[in-house]
Amino acid sequence: MLHKIGIMGALILGLAMPAAAECLIEKDSIAGIKLGQNLKQVKQKFPKAKMERESDPEGVAYVAITLSKDVMVITHQDGDDDPDAPIKLHKKIDSLETYSPACHTASGVHPGMKIKDAEAKLGKVKKIIMSEIEAREYAIFTRHPKHFEFRMEMGAGIYSGKGGVPNQTRRYRKGGSILEISVSKYGGFDN
């Protein structure tokens, strides 16, 4: 009898404890951080989050928010272009991105996933576009979800070399994978 009470107590306690936070990538949020929120609201929702001012190799400013050892979300704020400026807690977030493999879309697509595996969930690659300035590669799938961008690892696309800029292709390297997934108030590659 005591054995059954112990098991029942453990089950009840388990249900009362909060589940581990899931890092879901949706059209307007990543890991519960929403487009349009400001960083003060994010800090209130995630008091243990670590926020750091960073910049990419091109000098674009962003704030990296570390939610756990497995989850980091990069936020861009409208008009926040100075990587040396202090973090602006009241500016709204207009773009979110993550490189964290623990984060995934509702269909299970995540950073680090092979392009071939993503095709099983999003349809065949319709095209891969290489951006003109940074030479970043983005895949567009036949069932591409609106507002999402899927950035490929560098060198994933196989280009003919004859096209104009930006280069476009449907071919990719066998081991090519998704580097990052982002959502933005400006939308993504919806075509």
Language-model regions, residue ranges each:
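Internal interaction segment
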Residues: 147-151
